[in-house]
Amino acid sequence: MPEYKKRELKFIGSALKDLKQFPGKVKREVGFDLDMVQSGETPATAKSLTGLSGVMELVERYNKDTYRAVYVANIGGVVYVLHCFKKKSKQGIKTPKEDIDLIRQRLRQAKEEEKRS
């Protein structure tokens, strides 16, 4: 069986700082899931983010709160973590517009970074 080379993991903007603010159990779960993504697998907690092609989100629930880590894995063989946040909305599952706007901005940054390398 051929050995799969792990993809590099890069955080855009404040994504790493924001992830570090998550509760310990959530950080471990997200870290494990991102390790799976780096290895070419799709975690069970991953789902496609509506309206943004190729952008995925990891959803973790903890103590009645929902934490999300948004990433893209189809840019130059690198896994870019675009945004990590605690969902604040009490109604519905829709991602707030300000978070979507930030994700779009960081996706552009990731694409620009890939062009430079």
Predicted regions and their residues:
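Basic, Lys/Arg-enriched alpha-helical interface segments
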Residues: M1-T66, I75-V78, K88-S117
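Conserved catalytic cores of phosphodiester-cleaving nucleases, focusing on short active-site segments
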Residues: Y80-H83
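Hydrophobic/aromatic beta-strand elements that line small-molecule binding cavities or substrate pockets
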Residues: A69-Y71
